[in-house]
Amino acid sequence: MTRAVAEDLASSLEPDYRILHVLTTGGLEDLMDAIKTARKSEVDLLIGVGGGKPLDITKILAAELGVRYVVVPTSASHDGIASPSVSFTLSREIEERFGRVIRVEAPTAILADTTIINRASPITFKSGFGDLVAKITAVRDWELAYKLRDEPYSEYAASMSLLSAKIAMDHAHEIRTRLEESTRILVKALIGSGVAMSIAGSSRPASGSEHMFSHALDILSSEAGVKPAPHGIQVAIGTIMMAYLQGQDWKMIKEKLIEAGVPTTAEEAGISPDMIVKALTIAHKIRERYTILGSSGLTLSAAEKLARVTGVIK
């Protein structure tokens, strides 16, 4: 579907603009080739069409070329649509491979056609909902870092991030139906989360211990040679457990996730119980970000107890 959308968009622009097509799988070699091709062609504006990886590639290309970019999302699976950041995994790969961090900007414009987005796989909607609910624990982690580590904190950005989560949770049942109006609600909330990150100047309003848990799962999945669960699904499961540690109403969060059709157990998400527990024990090491996990993290027994008491594993 993504390619068809991109081709339709290019056809509508070609009478007035010179179009350079760049198709990429999202690998680092493809990224470097795309940068070289774009530089030779004196590109003025980039248009990213697709889900998470194509939009991340567009952001990096725009940063490297020093040009503006527009995004055309074809799914509502994550809050990176409007954010001034790329996925943690891709950012880490680039830093390890090239020894530097690429700073990206938020898009100049977002063209989100809900008719197109509504055709995406049902799991993308569940993933997007899970990514939004995660703001509840992310903001609490941010508040904790502000109080204990004097980390910069924006009440405005935090409030906007929590509002995005609230909007999604208030419409959990409608979002599960995937009617076009509910898709519009989900997309607006995801964009709102991205704007909150732009205001804060970091991903703090949207990413805390629950995302670190998800990143840990990504690493363990890669090491085991298995495909990880969708980002928002992993984050949703992490949110349930981190909310428990934070003393928040984790049962209400779990109920809303279930109402939206989001997997809330390791079995439903296709993740092994052992991997869930292992990810909990290493999540605090994933990045330099203070959260409810503290600097020492969870012991193996504490991690297993947490996963069991919240019903994530049996």
From Swiss-Prot:
Q: In which pathway does it act?
A: Membrane lipid metabolism; glycerophospholipid metabolism
Where located?
A: Cytoplasm
List of residues binding substrate:
79, 131, 215
Q: Could you tell me the keywords of this UniProt record? A: Cytoplasm, Lipid biosynthesis, Lipid metabolism, Metal-binding, NAD, NADP, Oxidoreductase, Phospholipid biosynthesis, Phospholipid metabolism, Zinc
Naming one, the record's GO cellular component terms include:
cytoplasm
Q: Which GO terms describe its molecular function?
A: glycerol-1-phosphate dehydrogenase (NAD+) activity; glycerol-1-phosphate dehydrogenase (NADP+) activity; metal ion binding
Q: How is the cofactor bound?
A: Binds 1 zinc ion per subunit.
Main location, first listed in the record: cytoplasm
Gene Ontology terms: biological process: glycerophospholipid metabolic process; phospholipid biosynthetic process
Name the Pfam families for this protein.
Answer: Fe-ADH_2 (PF13685)
Q: Which residues bind Zn(2+)?
A: 131, 211, 231
Enzyme Commission number, as recorded: 1.1.1.261
User: Domain of life here?
Assistant: Archaea
Binding of NAD(+), residues: 52-56, 74-77, 83
The UniProt entry's coiled-coil ranges are none
Q: Show the catalytic activity.
A: sn-glycerol 1-phosphate + NAD(+) = dihydroxyacetone phosphate + NADH + H(+); sn-glycerol 1-phosphate + NADP(+) = dihydroxyacetone phosphate + NADPH + H(+)
* Cofactor requirement: Zn(2+)
Q: Which family does it belong to?
A: Belongs to the glycerol-1-phosphate dehydrogenase family.
Q: What does this protein do?
A: Catalyzes the NAD(P)H-dependent reduction of dihydroxyacetonephosphate (DHAP or glycerone phosphate) to glycerol 1-phosphate (G1P). The G1P thus generated is used as the glycerophosphate backbone of phospholipids in the cellular membranes of Archaea.
Q: What's the protein called, per UniProt?
A: Glycerol-1-phosphate dehydrogenase [NAD(P)+]
